Amino acid sequence: MDKILEGLVSSSHPLPLKRVIVRKVVESAEHWLDEAQCEAMFDLTTRLILEGQDPFQRQVGHQVLEAYARYHRPEFESFFNKTFVLGLLHQGYHSLDRKDVAILDYIHNGLKLIMSCPSVLDLFSLLQVEVLRMVCERPEPQLCARLSDLLTDFVQCIPKGKLSITFCQQLVRTIGHFQCVSTQERELREYVSQVTKVSNLLQNIWKAEPATLLPSLQEVFASISSTDASFEPSVALASLVQHIPLQMITVLIRSLTTDPNVKDASMTQALCRMIDWLSWPLAQHVDTWVIALLKGLAAVQKFTILIDVTLLKIELVFNRLWFPLVRPGALAVLSHMLLSFQHSPEAFHLIVPHVVNLVHSFKNDGLPSSTAFLVQLTELIHCMMYHYSGFPDLYEPILEAIKDFPKPSEEKIKLILNQSAWTSQSNSLASCLSRLSGKSETGKTGLINLGNTCYMNSVIQALFMATDFRRQVLSLNLNGCNSLMKKLQHLFAFLAHTQREAYAPRIFFEASRPPWFTPRSQQDCSEYLRFLLDRLHEEEKILKVQASHKPSEILECSETSLQEVASKAAVLTETPRTSDGEKTLIEKMFGGKLRTHIRCLNCRSTSQKVEAFTDLSLAFCPSSSLENMSVQDPASSPSIQDGGLMQASVPGPSEEPVVYNPTTAAFICDSLVNEKTIGSPPNEFYCSENTSVPNESNKILVNKDVPQKPGGETTPSVTDLLNYFLAPEILTGDNQYYCENCASLQNAEKTMQITEEPEYLILTLLRFSYDQKYHVRRKILDNVSLPLVLELPVKRITSFSSLSESWSVDVDFTDLSENLAKKLKPSGTDEASCTKLVPYLLSSVVVHSGISSESGHYYSYARNITSTDSSYQMYHQSEALALASSQSHLLGRDSPSAVFEQDLENKEMSKEWFLFNDSRVTFTSFQSVQKITSRFPKDTAYVLLYKKQHSTNGLSGNNPTSGLWINGDPPLQKELMDAITKDNKLYLQEQELNARARALQAASASCSFRPNGFDDNDPPGSCGPTGGGGGGGFNTVGRLVF
C-alpha cells in the first residue's frame, strides 16, 4: 500500500483522480496490516509531511498518517518513540534542519495521536528537558510560537519544579531577543500574533506555578536594565506586562527603587525601555507600570533619573499620540511626566512646537474619539501653561488652536499640579526615616525662620497673598536693578514657583531690615511693615525723579542709592501728586487719604488738612483695654495719660504710648458746623460716665449688638475700633488747640474722616503700650471679633476750593503727630461732602502669640482675594450713597446692606484659608481664625489686611485675562525663571543626596521619627516655627517662648 501511495503522489495523473485514490487508501486503513507494512506507511507519510514538495503531498501525508495511526495505534506507538523524537529534535529529518517549525508541528501532531498510549509519559519527560534546551538556544519568534502552541496543548511537557523557573527565565530572555525587521503590515501582524502566543504561555505557567512569577519579572528587569551597548532588548517584552497582576505593583516598585544593587544607569535604562513599550500595539497596563515606577523613583527622591528620562523620552511619548492603538497609554504617561516635571519648563517646551499640528490634525478628522482626546490634551496644556506662564511667544499659537475647548478652573489646575509633583509622592518605606520635605499639600511655600524673623515672615506672606499687589510686583520690569523692590519681586517669584517646602529669604531680610532692628531678636511686625512700605514707596519716587531727569539713559539702581532714601524723600515730596498715573505702586495698593478737621469751640472757625496713610492704627476703647492688660511686672497697674491724639500712620514702633482721649463722646462724624450739643449720642449707642480721671468726663462707648462675653462683658469688633478711631474728640486741658483766629489756646473739636480709600486697607490693633509710670510694656489681650466683610466710611469731598487755597494736599507718608492739630490753619469755609460705605473683604490676619512685643511669636492667616467677586456685583447694587449727617458714617448693624452683608459673610466663611507659620503651611478655616484667642488667650490678632471690592476691576492693567497671564499672575521674566529653575534643580539634587544618605544609614540606624524642616534647624530664641490656632497643639506655658 505504501508503494502505491508513493507512486500516486509523484505521478502525473490529474489532481482530482489523485484525490479519489487517496480517499481509497485512507478508507483501507481499517484493514489489517502487519507491523512492517505499518512502519513503511508511517515512514512514507512522515516523509510526505516533512519533505513534501507541494501542499498536496503534505496534506496527503497528514490524512493517511492520522488514519493509519488511529487504526494501528500499537504500531504507531512503537514507531513514534523517544529515540525517533529525540533524533528529530537533535538532527532534524534528512535535509530538514532541526529548528524547522515543521518538525515541531510534526511532533505536536504525533503527541495528539498517541495521547492515550502509556508511552506518551516517556515522551513528556523527554520533552520537558528538550523544550528547555530549545528555549536556551533563543529560537526565532515563529518557532517559539509553535513551541508555545505545543506546550499550551500539552502542559505535561512544561518543565516542573526548579526547572520551571529556569524555563520561564530563559523564555523571557528569548522574548528579549525577538526582532521584526519587516515593515509590511501582514508580517507585522504575524509577528505580533507570535509574540502574543509566547506571552500567553508564560501567563499560563505563572498561574499554574506562582513561584515562577517573581523570578520571571526579575529576568525582565535584568534584560531592560542591561547597559550592554551591543544588546537592545526587544520591545516585545511589553507583551508580558498585561499578565502581571496589578496587585503586585506596590511590592515590585518598592523592591526595585530601594534595591541598593540597582545602579542609577541601570534604572535609567530600564525606565527608558519601559517607556519604549508604549509602542507595542496590544500591550495593556504598560502606562500603569511606567507611571508607578516614575512615582516610586520620586518617592525615594531619585530625581536625577526622573529628569534624565523625562528629557530623553518626552518627545517619543508625545509622538505616540498619533497612533490610535497606543494613544490612551501614551497620553497617560505624557500627562504624568509633564505634570510632575515642575522645576523647569524644559520638558514642556520640547513638545510645544508639535502641539499645534497635532491639535489641528485631530480637529479636522472630526471623530468623537479625537474630540474626547483633545479635551484631555487641552486640560494638560492649560495646566502646563499655567505653571510656566512666562512664555507668551510660545503659547499664543497653542491658545489659538485650543480656544474652542473647555479650560479647567484655576482651583482644578492647582489641585492637579499639587498632586502630580515629585515631592508629593509618599514613601511608606521611608516614613520612619524622614518626612519628605517637598511642598505641602496646600501648594504654598513657607519661609524659613532665620533667627527670630517670624515678624518678617508673617508680613511677607500676608503681602504675597494680597493677589493684586503680588501680580503688580511680579509684572514690574526691573532688569539690571538692585532695588529693594527687585528683591521683593525675586522673593515673590520663589514663593510662587519654588519646589521647596520653605524658602530662606536671607537676601531680602538683610536688605529690608530696619537699621535699628537688632538681628536675631524679636521685633514688631507692624513697625517692620510700615518701614518696608515706606522704603519701597520712597525708592520708587527716587527712580521716577531720576527717570524724568535722564529719560534717555538706562537707570542703574543700587544699594547706595537706596541709602539716600531718607535724605531725598523730603525733596521729592515737595512736588504734589496730580493723577493716579503718577502714584507709586505702594500708593496705588495701600495708600489712602485721611482728613483731619478741627473746629474751635470759641469762634467756630475750622481748619483741616489731608494726609496720606498706609495703615490705620486702631486703639481699644478704654473700658475694655484697661481690664485685660498683660504686664511684665504683675504688681504694676495701668496709667492713663489724657489729652492724646490717635495716630493714623506711624513710621515708628507701635509700642508707642497708647493714649486714650478721656473726653471722647459718641461716634459722630460731622464736618459741617453743628450747633447741637457736642457729644449727644446716637440712638444705637450709649455712653457711661467714668470719673476715674479728675476733671474729665471719660465717656466709654458700648455697642449694644456686640456679642456678650460671659459675665455680661462685650467682645469688641474691628468695626467698633474703627468707629472709635473716627469718633469726634474734644481737645481740652493740656491738649488745647491754638486757634489763629482767636490767637490763643482754645477748646476744640477734632474729627478725622477718610476721604480716599486704599485698595488694601491695613489695620493695626494697638495692643502694645508703654507704661511711663512703671516703665513696662503692656499687651492688651482683649479678643476682637474679625468681620469678614467690613464697610469703610469714605467721605467724598465735592467742593474743596477753600482747602486748596489755604493748604496743598501733600501725599507723603508721615505720621499725624499729636501736635498736628495745633499747627493747622483755619480754612474759613465748609465743603459739602457725602459718605459712601466701601466694602472690604478680610484677606490676611497677622497674629501675635505672647505677652510682650519683645517676645512671643508671629504667624499669619491668609487667603486669595482678587479685585472682583461675582457675589459683589449684587452688593454694589444695594449700596446707598447719602449726604453726610451726624450719624452717617456709623458702622452699626442697621446699615442698609447689613442683611446682604451677613449673607456674604456666610458665603465667605466656607472659602479656603491658609495658616502660614514660618516653614509650615497648612489648610485652615475662618472658624479657626475667629476662635484663636478663645483657644489660646495669648494669641491675638494684630495686623489685618482687608481687600477692597469693586463692581468692576478698578485696577487698570491688572486684568488677569489681558495679554497672556495664564494663571492670573503675569509671566515671569527670563532672569527670574532661570534663577528658579536653577534652584529647583539644586533642590532636587539635595533631596536625592539626602535620600541616598538615609538609605545607607537605614540598616543600622534606629527608626525614630523627627521631621526635619520643622523645628530642628530653627535658631534658639523667643520665636519658633510652629504654634497658633488651627494647627496648635502646644499648651499655654509651652507657647510663651519657643
Swiss-Prot record:
Enzyme type, top EC level: hydrolase
Cellular compartments per GO CC: cytoplasm; cytosol; nucleus
Domain USP: 445-949
CDD domains assigned: Peptidase_C19H (cd02664)
Effect of residue 857 to A: Loss of deubiquitinating activity
Keyword line: Cytoplasm, Hydrolase, Nucleus, Protease, Thiol protease, Ubl conjugation pathway
Compartments it resides in: Cytoplasm; Nucleus
Active-site residues annotated for this sequence: 454, 857
Protein name per the record: Ubiquitin carboxyl-terminal hydrolase 38
Organism field: Homo sapiens (Human)
UniProt lineage: Eukaryota, Metazoa, Chordata, Craniata, Vertebrata
Gene giving rise to this polypeptide: USP38
